[in-house]
From Swiss-Prot:
Belongs to the class I-like SAM-binding methyltransferase superfamily. TrmB family. SUPFAM superfamilies: S-adenosyl-L-methionine-dependent methyltransferases. It catalyses: guanosine(46) in tRNA + S-adenosyl-L-methionine = N(7)-methylguanosine(46) in tRNA + S-adenosyl-L-homocysteine. Gene3D superfamilies: Vaccinia Virus protein VP39. This is tRNA (guanine-N(7)-)-methyltransferase. Its EC number is 2.1.1.33. The keyword tRNA processing applies. Pathway: tRNA modification; N(7)-methylguanine-tRNA biosynthesis. Keywords: Methyltransferase, S-adenosyl-L-methionine, Transferase, tRNA processing.
């Protein structure tokens, strides 16, 4: 189902002090943008922002870059992030929100940004063979991520899709990533520190298991 147009979204985003209108201008300078040397985590496809809002408000010593493509969803993410910080009475200074096509992620990040962790949560599985190169875990994308992931940087990947998960294991191997942790049922695995996304809650209620892995960049 397509999200309805939200005429308020773009003006509200542009007046928001943590929304980056032109992320390309910060390429290689994201630590300067945050004005500190804290680790930077990147969420690809942040949706309505629930995941990054929880992470950011719970981890003030980590910086977060949250990316999606549509103003409508980013507008909701902006509001959810603000709400989470307000409820905890915390200052919002460790999240940057922006619109960016993930296939062109190298236009806004490079090796000087030294991203410590990437989150990929319930991305489009692109099941048709002709579309598989669009997957966010495809080897073509992993090659881009390697450019700005620091040494031993991590990718945390969650999905409900069995085929995507199995084929992603091969992508990570081809892309020179080591699988550090894997489970085919995250919610019964005993793994600590999981933050559920909107999709994750929905799938869990439907009895669909969440597959999860942590991949480490190898030289």
């Amino acid at each position: 189902m397509r999200m309805r147009k939200k005429p308020w979204a773009r003006p509200e985003l542009e007046s928001c002090n943590f929304f980056i209108v032109n992320p390309k201008e910060n390429k290689g300078k994201w630590k300067e943008s945050f004005n500190n040397e804290n680790p930077i985590y990147l969420e690809l496809g942040c949706g309505k922002g629930v995941f990054v809002a929880v992470h950011g408000s719970n981890n003030e010593n980590i910086n977060y870059i949250a990316i999606d493509i549509k103003d409508e969803v980013l507008g909701l993410a902006k509001r959810n992030i603000e709400k989470a910080y307000k409820e905890k009475n915390k200052e919002l200074n460790n999240i940057k929100l922006m619109a960016q096509e993930i296939g062109l992620i190298n236009e806004m990040l490079d090796e000087n940004d030294k991203i410590s962790r990437i989150y990929i949560n319930f991305c489009n599985p692109w099941p048709k063979k002709k579309h598989k190169k669009r997957r966010l875990t495809h080897t073509r994308q992993l090659t881009q991520y390697r450019n700005f992931l620091k040494e031993n940087g991590e990718i945390w990947f969650k999905t409900d899709d069995d085929e995507l998960f199995e084929e992603s294991l091969e992508y990570f191997k081809e892309g020179k990533f080591r699988i550090e942790y894997i489970t085919y049922d995250l919610h019964t695995s005993g793994f600590e520190g999981n933050v559920q996304t909107e999709h994750e809650r929905m799938f869990t209620e439907q009895g669909i298991k969440t597959k999860f892995l942590i991949a480490i960049k190898e030289d």
